[in-house]
From Swiss-Prot:
Its EC number is 2.7.-.-. This is Probable protein kinase UbiB. The keyword Ubl conjugation does not apply. The chain crosses the membrane at residues 13-35, 485-502. The lineage of its organism: Bacteria, Pseudomonadati, Pseudomonadota, Betaproteobacteria, Neisseriales. The active site is at residue 283.
Length: 503
């Protein structure tokens, strides 16, 4: 009955942080809404805004609910702006777990003692979070490494909270007036995937390797090497990186780092990942970024990445170019063409809504305009028009806000549009014209080479199938005609019989 005990804790938290009223307001009306309003409320925190109380409640419920709040903060298409801003303040910081447990977990996962695995292993962790903690070590071959190890016995705790979230999401969808639009079950399912992805450190290792290949020999970004012989789903061993935290501006200046160049690098790295690679680091907050002595960024923590299809890239390029040209009609038609907008949406209404939220953003010098804010405004419009926002674009918006904030912290005069526009124009130009046609033909050639030899047979089979379908349809039609005829004959026979009997 552990789940019942946990449910009691959650309900008690709702009381303590006065959230029953918030639930009632979301429900709209009805007897359950009235019942919630009648529930006793704690006298504490009564002067705090609802968004603040929700953040404090999630913090008190522990790491899994904190992470859930962080995920919600990236969904301005689902929750109001003030809630998104407040939930973004949630911090995933917990005390480290016992070093003995850490050693046991590593030895169990890698099948050898710590002494055989590492020449040196620092017992005191250098970083700790709700999912894992990190130790510094040295391999017998001499390389300095960082060893990330999952918290022991974490999965049962996560599954218990997730099952309660799924249970709650089902009731939210049934009872709340806004339940279906909020898509609570989809949000919890997305969070479930996000959490389980973070729990698989082999996936993180693969993400690091992919990003490393994409930026091999780059003069802008360093990605640590992965030591796969010392990795499992529970343990990750990567190259140790020395650098200055990107948030330590004073030290960066003292070290002679070119902050203007560094800010430009950040924007260029981001748009290179998006439009060249379609694969981007989606957790680029200052805590995951160091700066090397040679003015390059060092990326850390590869648990969350995003991938983009050519369709996603086209959506982004069209929308950004249209936004900065104030072509709101094109923004509206791009959304309708994407198929993410309900079929009955009128382009004129969507255009007017986009103009209303974006004109205030663009009524300032272009160098001061926030790309992330533009996307956020777009997501706010999406809430009103029931636009289906793709998870990868939400991740992208969150990452873009981080990159912008970081860039302007390094260089307040950073002009993102100046750096981004060449990427957008180059990518759009690359999608049309003879070169693009030739590239697409080359990419599709292997598929056509397989299809063409079997094409006559497939066409013949299709014709036969159509002919057989026509014969089946004709047979069914004939049977129906005969059934109708039989029915009429039966009716006539009954009528004649009745006439004879009445005589």
């Amino acid at each position: 009955m552990k789940w019942l005990k946990r449910l009691t804790v959650i309900v008690g938290t709702f009381y303590r942080y006065r959230l029953a009223g918030l639930c009632a307001s979301l429900m709209g009306s009805g007897w359950i809404c009235a019942l919630l309003k009648m529930m006793p409320q704690s006298s504490k925190l009564k002067n705090e805004p609802p968004a603040v109380r929700l953040r404090l409640a999630l913090e008190s419920l522990g790491p899994i609910f904190i992470k859930f709040g962080q995920v919600l903060s990236t969904r301005p298409d689902l929750i109001p702006h003030d809630y998104a801003v407040e939930l973004a303040k949630l911090q995933d910081k917990v005390p480290p777990f016992d070093a003995r447990l850490s050693r046991e977990q590593i030895e169990k996962s890698l099948g050898q003692s710590i002494e055989k695995l590492y020449a040196e292993f620092e017992t005191e962790p250098i970083a700790s979070a709700s999912i894992a903690q990190v130790h510094k070590a040295r391999l017998h071959s001499g390389e300095q490494v960082a060893v990330k190890v999952l918290r022991p016995n974490l999965l049962p705790v996560i599954e218990q909270d997730l099952s309660l979230m799924r249970f709650g999401a089902g009731w939210v969808e049934r009872l709340f007036a806004d339940g279906k639009r909020l898509k609570p079950r989809e949000v919890v399912a997305e969070f479930d995937k996000y959490l389980h992805d973070e729990l698989d450190l082999m996936r993180e290792a693969a993400n690091a390797s992919q990003l490393g290949r994409n930026f091999q020999n780059s003069d802008m970004l360093i990605v640590p090497k992965v030591f796969y012989d010392y990795c499992t789903s529970d343990v990750l061993t990567i190259e140790w990186m020395d650098g200055t935290p990107v948030s330590d501006i004073a030290k960066l200046k003292a070290d002679g780092i070119d902050l203007h160049k560094l800010a430009d690098y950040g924007v260029e790295i981001f748009f290179t990942q998006v439009f060249r690679d379609g694969f981007f680091h989606a957790d680029m907050h200052p805590g995951n970024i160091l700066v090397a002595a040679d003015n390059r960024y060092i990326a850390l923590d590869f648990g969350i990445v995003g991938t983009l299809t050519d369709y996603d890239k086209r959506y982004l390029a069209i929308n950004f170019l249209a936004f900065f040209n104030r072509d709101y009609r094109r923004v509206a038609t791009a959304h309708i063409e994407s198929g993410w907008v309900p079929a009955d949406t009128r382009a004129e209404e969507l255009e007017a809504a986009v103009r209303a939220v974006c004109e205030p953003v663009f009524n300032k010098p272009i160098s001061q305009i926030s790309f992330g804010l533009v996307l956020m405004r777009l997501f706010e419009v999406s809430r009103r028009f029931n636009v289906e926002i793709q998870p990868q674009l939400v991740l992208l918006q969150k990452t873009l806000l981080n990159i912008e904030g970081l860039g302007r912290q390094l260089d307040p005069d950073l002009d993102l549009w100046k750096t981004a526009k060449p990427f957008l124009v180059k990518w759009m130009n690359g999608q049309v014209g003879p070169k693009a046609l030739w590239r697409n033909l080359k990419n599709e050639a292997p598929d056509w080479a397989q299809i063409i030899p079997s094409l006559p047979r497939k066409i013949s089979a299709l014709i036969d199938e159509n002919r057989q379908q026509e014969m089946r349809d004709a047979y069914i039609h004939l049977v129906k005609v005969q059934q109708r005829q039989s029915l009429w004959l039966a009716v006539i026979a009954v009528v004649l019989l009745l006439i004879l009997l009445l005589k």
